Amino acid sequence: MAQKKGGGSTRNGRDSQPKMLGVKVFGGQRITAGSIIVRQRGTRFHPGSNVGMGKDHSLFALVDGQVSFGIKGALSKPTVNVTPAASAPPV
């Protein structure tokens, strides 16, 4: 029998690129239409009024305005809303 193990290759040495997920614009901040509010995997946050969702579940503003976060429904789902700029209070 062999007294030493064969010199196999290492199983380490690789890493995935960062995905840059998370909230990009916080509550109370102004935003322009088309700007990303949240990058996420799955629906951690749900789109509310004036917010759209991309195929990768990213949330983006449909109108210029002010971002707000809230809770919606019986299941207490966190939602993201954009108040249009005309009716948004000054910051």
From Swiss-Prot:
Protein family per UniProt: Belongs to the bacterial ribosomal protein bL27 family.
A cellular component term, taken from the record's GO annotations: cytosolic large ribosomal subunit
HAMAP family: Ribosomal_bL27
Bias kind Gly residues: ranges: 1-10
Domain of life: Bacteria
MF (Gene Ontology): structural constituent of ribosome
Protein name (database record): Large ribosomal subunit protein bL27
One GO process term, biological-process aspect: translation
Keyword annotations from UniProtKB, A to Z: Ribonucleoprotein, Ribosomal protein
Database matches in InterPro entries: Ribosomal_bL27, Ribosomal_bL27_CS
Region (Disordered): 1-20
